[in-house]
Amino acid sequence: MKRTTYIMLAVFLGGFVMAGIFCMILLSNPRGRDRNKIYNIGGPAVTLSISEPFSRIVFDDTSDDGDYHIKVGFAVEMSDSVSAPCLRTTYEWQKLLTTAVAGDTLNVAFNLDNLVDSLRMAEDDSHPYLSSEEFWGITVIIPRGMTLRGVDGRQRLVMLKNFNGGSVEVQTNRCALSVRNCTLDSIIVPKLGVPKLSVDSSTVNYVRIPLGEDDLKVDCKDASGLIKRMEVRGVNKVKAKNRGDLNLADANISTLVWSPAPTDSVRTLDLRIKDGMEIICNNQ
């Protein structure tokens, strides 16, 4: 056989093999399968009573296991209209949530066992997205005067609303924190930092946030948002990046304290501020 004939046969066989592989891919993921389908979770408002006392809240988020992507904000609100704690959500979210008090901690978690049945998912749905019709779709409401020491949102964006006095420790897994209509003595973020802190119609006397693997932007919507003193701390992490970005151009902060850690790997700090902000470098 001529050389050109061999080449033509090779091209034909190669095309045949590629066509077979393509068909196998189509068969393994047919059009009928919903890959990354978005489920909008909503329904009428529902309020669930919480009878046992607590001083900390943990959103025990076990949903990010590679199979589900759940997008809903977690809010904690202080209110004069309730005499006991409760959880406000929607009818469809309520079917997916469990609440339990252990010691001084209220645990709010997704009940993944009910997920497929409640949403009537097809068994072959791949990596579905659950999106809340209301952005802050899950809210724990506590009576005014109740002491709340800590909130751990895990994978959730966290909002504090209508707090009047007191100090709160807030932990998120590198998710944004929003403060709305609050007057607080202090907000402490103990471990992982937050990429964004939004302060709206609120005054916070003292904020402490670590700056390590994430940059930080602080945003005050207008003059009604004020942080009197904010301390940004470096971290002792080998894997932390050498350069940190601290954007305070839209923040109303009276005094900024930068406290690098003794072995802080954030060697260069890119800082953007407003005029008139006092800056203190607290070398430890």
Q: Model-found features: residue ranges?
A:
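Beta-strand secondary-structure signal
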Residues: 56-58, 107, 139, 169, ...
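Flexible, charged surface loops at secondary-structure boundaries
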Residues: 49-53, 80, 142, 181, ...
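Extracellular beta-helix/beta-solenoid repeat scaffolds
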Residues: 64-66, 77-92, 145-147, 166-169, ...
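Short, surface-exposed interaction patches in beta-rich subdomains
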Residues: 198-284
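Right-handed parallel beta-helix
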Residues: 92, 96-190, 194-199, 206, ...
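Short acidic/polar N-terminal linker immediately downstream of export determinants
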Residues: 2-12, 19-94, 113-142, 154-159
